[in-house]
Design a protein with these regions (language model features):
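Short glycine/proline- and aromatic-enriched beta-strand/turn motifs that initiate or cap beta-hairpins
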Residues: 24-77, 82-90
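Transmembrane beta-strands of outer-membrane beta-barrel pores
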Residues: 46-50, 72-78, 92, 97-99, ...
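Short loop/turn motifs that connect adjacent beta-strands in outer-membrane beta-barrel proteins
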Residues: 27-38, 65, 100-110, 150-156
Length: 191
């Protein structure tokens, strides 16, 4: 059961990109053919918020067809009795190529293809009996998505990705106020 939870949490981390994301866009006063020029998009992943994982993303357009998306996640929840721990420090970058006619759309709206890489450290203990701690995890893959403007400074993004995740972890159990190492292993996931 604990291994299933561990796999589920890692799967959730990898595929939370399938969420709708609220995007706040700063746009310049200049417009070309009724489109505004996006200078910077500040974003938040709503699925991470539902999982109590504070996060922020910044997307920077690079020319008409390209953009760079940088994200950071940092849930750091634990109790003092060694009964619960939900800690993740993660960052990643994604290069995006925007498809379609860029003359009739904003620079960060419509369909896109992307390639991402991310990494971080984690410690998950959902039950007192066992937990999993990793000094690192690394993931990389490709994405497809669509951004739909809702208002002048608001849009929603949907994306789906497939990739590879690699991590070395230590399984532990809590004994009083101490954590006792039980075993260690490697985990590889494609999905």
């Amino acid at each position: 059961m604990g291994k299933r939870i561990f796999i589920y949490v890692l799967w959730l981390l990898l595929f939370c990109m399938m969420s709708g994301q609220v995007i706040g866009q700063n746009k310049s006063a200049e417009s070309h053919s009724h489109t505004c020029k996006t200078v910077l998009a500040l974003k938040n992943n709503l699925l991470y918020d539902l999982a109590l994982a504070p996060n922020i993303e910044v997307e920077l357009p690079l020319g008409k067809r390209w953009s760079l998306n940088v994200e950071y996640k940092c849930p750091w929840w634990s109790d003092s009795g060694c009964n619960f721990c939900y800690q993740l420090l993660s960052g990643g970058m994604e290069g995006r190529c925007w498809l379609g006619n860029r003359h009739t759309r904003g620079r960060t709206s419509g369909h896109f293809l992307g390639a991402y890489a991310e990494g971080g450290t984690y410690d998950f203990q959902l039950k007192k009996e066992k937990g999993y701690r990793g000094k690192y995890y690394a993931a990389a893959g490709i994405t497809y998505g669509y951004v739909r403007p809702l208002a002048r400074h608001l849009a929603i993004e949907f994306s789906v990705g497939i990739g590879y995740l690699d991590t070395e972890y230590r399984k532990y159990t809590s004994y009083g106020n101490d954590l006792v190492w039980v075993s260690s292993g490697k985990y590889h996931f494609i999905g």
